[in-house]
C-alpha cells in the first residue's frame, strides 16, 4: 500500500469501529488486507480500459446549474468544463477560456475562449453559450444555488464570437477563481432543451447511461479539446450503499476506486499494498445545523447551550478518526487558511449549558430529533457522538438516519436540527455566500444578519490583503458569538483506489478529474 499525502496525515491508529453492526460487516474483509500483490510500474501512459468507481450515495440531478449533491458535482466534472480550471492547489488555470484579464479596479473581467472546442452533440462552443449559461444561473426561475454567489455580476455580454465580458457591481479580485471553482458554473450549450435529461458538455467524457440508484456510465469524448486526453475508454460509477461492499470490491479488484471512504475503513485500505489512500486539504466541513427560525433554536440561549454541550476535539475524532484534522470553532474558516483568526475553540461546559436551557424554559432538558444522512463519511458518526454528549445536559436526542436522496428532498432546508456535509469550494467567499448570506438559497439555518451580509460583501470588495483579513476576522467573531451551527472540524477529501490507477490527481473539492488517468 502507498499513501499519497497531499496534506498532513497521521500514520498512527485510526479510532476503532464503535458500531458493532459495521464491525461485523468488515471483520472478514480486513483479513484480506495483507493479500495484495504489488504490480509493476509502467513508465508511459496507456490508452484504453474501463474503471469502476463506487459511491455510497446515488446522483439524483443531472442539470449542472441546479445539482445539489456531491455525487452529482463530482461526476458532472467529467462531463462539463468551466471557463477556468481551479487546480488541486486552488490556483486558477486556463480551461475553456485560454486567457482572461481584468481592469485595475477588478470590476470588468474579459475572457477569451478557445477556438474549436466542441460540445458532445457536435456544435462548437462560442460566446453565446457562456452568456446563456450565466444568464440561466442568474434567472430566479432556474433556482440555481449559484445565483447568490454571483450576485455581484451586473451583466455578462458577448464581445465577439470568442470573447465574453463580465461587468461587476463591485470589485472582486478572485472572480477568475469563482468562475473556475463554482460547482454550478459549468458551461452548457444554449440549444439543449433539458439538461437534466440530456447532459451535454465539452468535458472529457460523455454521459451515456444513468440508472438512478444503480449506476452511471461515462464514455471517452474522442473530440476532447485537450489533445490526447482522456486515456480511459469508460468510467462506470456504481451505487453501493454498504461500505463493506466497497472494501470487498477494492480488495478483490472488482472496483478501482472508493469515493470518500469513512475513517473506519481507512486502516483496512492502508494495510493493503495494492491500494493508495489520498488525502487532500479542503475547506469542506460537516456542520450540525440549528434552524434559528424554528423552536427551540429561535432562542439564542438554546443555540449557545447546544454549542457548549459539544466537545469539539472528541467529535472530530469520532467523525474523522486519527486523520490530522485541526479542531474548528463553529465557523467556515478553517484553521489552515491564511484568513483564520487565531482563537481558542469554545470549550465544553455542561453546567452552563444546563443553566442556559433552564433559563430558556427547559429546566428538565428536552427531547429532540436530529436528522443525519447515510452515504457521507462522518455524518452519522458525528450525530451519534453529539447525541452521547448531550445526555449529560439532559438533552435527549433521537438520531434519525435516512439515505442522502431522501434527506435532501424531504429534510434538508426544512428540518430544525440536522447534520450535513459541505464540500470545500475554491474561495472562502463562496463558502460564506452559499450558506450564510441572508437571501442564499442554501441558507440552511435561516440565520439572517445584515451585519454578516455586509461583511460578506466586504470580503468580496476589499482588495488589500491585510484589510481583507480584518474583514474575515470580524466574520469569525460574529460566528463565535452566535453561530447557528456547530462546526467542530474541517474534513479533508479522501479517496482510496487501486495502485494500477495512474496519474489520478485528487482534488480538495472531491471532483473526479480523470483527464490524465490511465490504467497501468
Regions found by a protein language model. Name each.
Residues 392, 396-407, 431-499, 520:
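Extracytoplasmic/peripheral linker and loop segments enriched in polar/acidic and small residues
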Residues 205, 324-359, 376-379:
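Structural transition elements
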Residues 1-18, 28-30:
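N-terminal secretory signal peptides
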Residues 54-104, 135, 200-202:
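N-terminal lobe/hinge region of extracytoplasmic solute-binding protein
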Residues 193, 223-268, 387-388, 396-398:
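Ligand-site clamp/hinge motif
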Residues 112, 146-188, 209:
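Surface-exposed binding/hinge segments that line
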Residues 268, 293, 297-336, 381-382, ...:
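Periplasmic-binding protein-like
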Residues 87-91, 172, 177-236, 242-244, ...:
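Gly/Pro-rich hinge or "lid" segments in bacterial periplasmic/extracellular proteins
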Amino acid at each position: 500500500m502507498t499513501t499519497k499525502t497531499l496534506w498532513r496525515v497521521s500514520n498512527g491508529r485510526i479510532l476503532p469501529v464503535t458500531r458493532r453492526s459495521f464491525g461485523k460487516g468488515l471483520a472478514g474483509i480486513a483479513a484480506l488486507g495483507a493479500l495484495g500483490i504489488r504490480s509493476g510500474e509502467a513508465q508511459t501512459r496507456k490508452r484504453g480500459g474501463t474503471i469502476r468507481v463506487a459511491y455510497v450515495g446515488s446522483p439524483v440531478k443531472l442539470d449542472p446549474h441546479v445539482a445539489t449533491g456531491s455525487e452529482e458535482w463530482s461526476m458532472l466534472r467529467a462531463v462539463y468544463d468551466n471557463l477556468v480550471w481551479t487546480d488541486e492547489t486552488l490556483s486558477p488555470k486556463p480551461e475553456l477560456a485560454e486567457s482572461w484579464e481584468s481592469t485595475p479596479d477588478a470590476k470588468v473581467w474579459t475572457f477569451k475562449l478557445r477556438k474549436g472546442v466542441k460540445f458532445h452533440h457536435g456544435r462548437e462552443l462560442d460566446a453565446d453559450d457562456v452568456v446563456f449559461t450565466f444568464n440561466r444561473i442568474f434567472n430566479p426561475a432556474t433556482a440555481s444555488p449559484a445565483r447568490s454567489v454571483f450576485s455581484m455580476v451586473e451583466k455578462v455580454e458577448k464581445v465577439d464570437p470568442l470573447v465574453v465580458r463580465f461587468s461587476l457591481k463591485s470589485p472582486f479580485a478572485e472572480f477568475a477563481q469563482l468562475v473556475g471553482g463554482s460547482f454550478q458554473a459549468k458551461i452548457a450549450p444554449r440549444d439543449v432543451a433539458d439538461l437534466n435529461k440530456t447532459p451535454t458538455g465539452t468535458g472529457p467524457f460523455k454521459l451515456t447511461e444513468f440508472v438512478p440508484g444503480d449506476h452511471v456510465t461515462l464514455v471517452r469524448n474522442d473530440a476532447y479539446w485537450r489533445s490526447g486526453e482522456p486515456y480511459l475508454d469508460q468510467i462506470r460509477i456504481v451505487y453501493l450503499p454498504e461500505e463493506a461492499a466497497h472494501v470487498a470490491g477494492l480488495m478483490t479488484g472488482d472496483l478501482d476506486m472508493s469515493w470518500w471512504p469513512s475513517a473506519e475503513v481507512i486502516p483496512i485500505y492502508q494495510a493493503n499494498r495494492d491500494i493508495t489512500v489520498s488525502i487532500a486539504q479542503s475547506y469542506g466541513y460537516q456542520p450540525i445545523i440549528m434552524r434559528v427560525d424554528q423552536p427551540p433554536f429561535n432562542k439564542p440561549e438554546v443555540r449557545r447551550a447546544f454549542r457548549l454541550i459539544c466537545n469539539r476535539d472528541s467529535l472530530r475524532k469520532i467523525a474523522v478518526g486519527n486523520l490530522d484534522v485541526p479542531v474548528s470553532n463553529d465557523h467556515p474558516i478553517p484553521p489552515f487558511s491564511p484568513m483564520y483568526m487565531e482563537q481558542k475553540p469554545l470549550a465544553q461546559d455542561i453546567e452552563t449549558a444546563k443553566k442556559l436551557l433552564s433559563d430558556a424554559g427547559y429546566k428538565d432538558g428536552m427531547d429532540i430529533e436530529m436528522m443525519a444522512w447515510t452515504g457521507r463519511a462522518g455524518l452519522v458518526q458525528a450525530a451519534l457522538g453529539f447525541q452521547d454528549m448531550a445526555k449529560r445536559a439532559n438533552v435527549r436526542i433521537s438520531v434519525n438516519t435516512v439515505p442522502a436522496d431522501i434527506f435532501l428532498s424531504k429534510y434538508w432546508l426544512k428540518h430544525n436540527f440536522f447534520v450535513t456535509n459541505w464540500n470545500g469550494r475554491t474561495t472562502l467567499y463562496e463558502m460564506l455566500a452559499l450558506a450564510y448570506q441572508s437571501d442564499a438559497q442554501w441558507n440552511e439555518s435561516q440565520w439572517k444578519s445584515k451585519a454578516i451580509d455586509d461583511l460578506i460583501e466586504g470580503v468580496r470588495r476589499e482588495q488589500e490583503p491585510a484589510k481583507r483579513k480584518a474583514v474575515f476576522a470580524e466574520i469569525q467573531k460574529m460566528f463565535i458569538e452566535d453561530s447557528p451551527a456547530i462546526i467542530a472540524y474541517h474534513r479533508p477529501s479522501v479517496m482510496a483506489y487501486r495502485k494500477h490507477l495512474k496519474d489520478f490527481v485528487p482534488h480538495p473539492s472531491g471532483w473526479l478529474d480523470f483527464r490524465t488517468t490511465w490504467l497501468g
